[in-house]
Amino acid sequence: MNILNLKIIMFLLISNTIVVGGAWATSTCPDWPATRIAVEINALEQQLNKWSAAYHQQGHSPVTDDIYDQLQDKLRVWQSCRGLPDKTESQPIPGKGQFLHPVAHTGLKKLKDETALTRWMAGRKNLWVQPKVDGVAVTLVYHGGKLVQLLSRGNGVKGQNWTEKAPFISAIPQYIANAPALLTLQGELFLLMDGHQQAKSGGVNARSTVAGALMRKSPSPLLAQVGVFIWAWPDGPTTMKEKVALLQVMGFPFTAKYSEPVMSHLDVVQWRQFWFQAPLPFVTDGVVVRQEEEPAGRYWQATPGQWSMAWKYPPLQHIAEVKDIHFTLGRTGKGTVVLEVLPIKIDDKWIRRVNIGSVTRWKQWDIAPGDHITLALAGHGIPRLDNVVWRVHQRNTITAPNWDKFHQLSCFQRLPHGCEPQFLSRLIWLSGPGGLDIGGIGGGFWQELIHHELINDLVGWLLLTPEQIASIPGIGNARAEKIYQQFQRAKQQPFSRWLLALGFPQVVSVDAQWQVVLRRSLSEWATMAGIGQMRAKQIKHFLDHPDVQALADFLSTQKVVGFELTE
């Protein structure tokens, strides 16, 4: 394979996968008519604009940066599906304000991953990395060394006047000796923290806290806990080394302390990981890589510049798109709803399905195909639904099946009609770790037996011959013989495991026998440790059920441990 073909294949692989700060998600075009995708693009774009305006005008947003960035990535995918240009990076920063910035705030374009970082750094020199401080962006304007304006970022061109709050922020020098006649600085007002570790504590709502204090009409005591990190000095010294040294002399020490020269992408990777774990005096959400060489301030615009880039930390919340909704019937007759999502990789685990519980819970969530949800990994790596962050505009009606006739003692057989889902769930439980723990036997195998009508009740598999098992497509003679031997050995499993495999509501002692269990009265069960009156009734209903007794009779003929007839 030549190099050109290899590059093409790599491009195709990359173009069909998006990386969102450590979470991998497939990026396929939705199977929608052109009219619908246009409607959905417009709806998502409007919502993102509203959130962005709230962020820049009020210092907070109804959604986290993680969610916003991932939904913005989704918008790009949808736009590319229609051949529309990506306008997300060139759009003006939304916001409001009446006071003109001497130099526009450019904002930052975000790098998706290490590959994008390497590509951007190629051919550039004199690069530095800084923590991306999570706070409120401002402009500081000094005339003759005196602070004359403190402006919010606003829309990048105009901002609000917060100058009256500046005297209450001790981190902002009110006068700088030997300063240039006109000095314009851009930076971040942040909440001073004591050894904040981003990897452990996250954002702790620090930005909103600072924004709230700045927007109050009367000065807030919280302003005394606000620091400032200067990240831009338009038309300042040409080298970063001189720039940070002068900033420190002028009373802005954080820039010098947290600016590091980098030679390669590996240096950036190391600093990013270090600052993610290290105790810091501020909240961060990534790193910023910037080059010394930058245009004169008069050329800056309120759109991301090309001389600095942000590389954010892995998201704490991961978005998945709901592809379909499946209704499953468990072995006890309880229905559950499983969301099928476009595959997303969280940490080292690929997520494709998420169990969200009962139909009632699903209705409360109001989830439809196309909706976007946030997922997290709970105990044992099981995916958990956290929230619905975006609902599609066009919602297809989905009707849940009626499961009223199913219960704890229904469907020990494949028939009657409608029993197959619960029957399959019983078989999966029977062969699983909670039952007989038959290695390598799961839902796929049982489904094939049902499909080929080789099994009609919960224990009918004990009668199967190697030849019958081998008749299933994909199972050869050798594997069929192995499965047959596993089934025969299952007869020697402890009686207590057999009871659990059949669906018995409570563990009993291993040395019990079916006849002994059957003769116990309701009151005897109720007085046993850990059972009680309610569970005792469930046990008696189970033991007295004709289908269960038929299964026990069959197991007796098969000489299964504990079910043999005693004289």
UniProtKB/Swiss-Prot annotation:
One Pfam family matching this protein: DNA_ligase_aden
HAMAP family: DNA_ligase_B
SMART domains in the record: LIGANc
Similarity comment: family membership: Belongs to the NAD-dependent DNA ligase family. LigB subfamily.
UniProt-recorded name of the protein: DNA ligase B
Native organism taxonomy: Bacteria, Pseudomonadati, Pseudomonadota, Gammaproteobacteria, Enterobacterales
Catalytic activity annotation: NAD(+) + (deoxyribonucleotide)n-3'-hydroxyl + 5'-phospho-(deoxyribonucleotide)m = (deoxyribonucleotide)n+m + AMP + beta-nicotinamide D-nucleotide
GO MF annotations in UniProt: DNA ligase (NAD+) activity
Listed InterPro entries: DNA_ligase_B, DNAligase_adenylation, DNAligase_N, NA-bd_OB-fold, NAD_dep_DNA_ligaseB, NAD_DNA_ligase_OB, RuvA_2-like
Catalytic site: 132 (n6-amp-lysine intermediate)
Its biological purpose: Catalyzes the formation of phosphodiester linkages between 5'-phosphoryl and 3'-hydroxyl groups in double-stranded DNA using NAD as a coenzyme and as the energy source for the reaction.
Entry's EC annotation: 6.5.1.2
SUPFAM superfamilies in the record: DNA ligase/mRNA capping enzyme, catalytic domain, Nucleic acid-binding proteins, RuvA domain 2-like
GO biological process: DNA repair; DNA replication
PANTHER family (alphabetical): DNA LIGASE, DNA LIGASE B
Keywords in alphabetical order: DNA damage, DNA repair, DNA replication, Ligase, NAD
CDD domains associated with the record: LIGANc
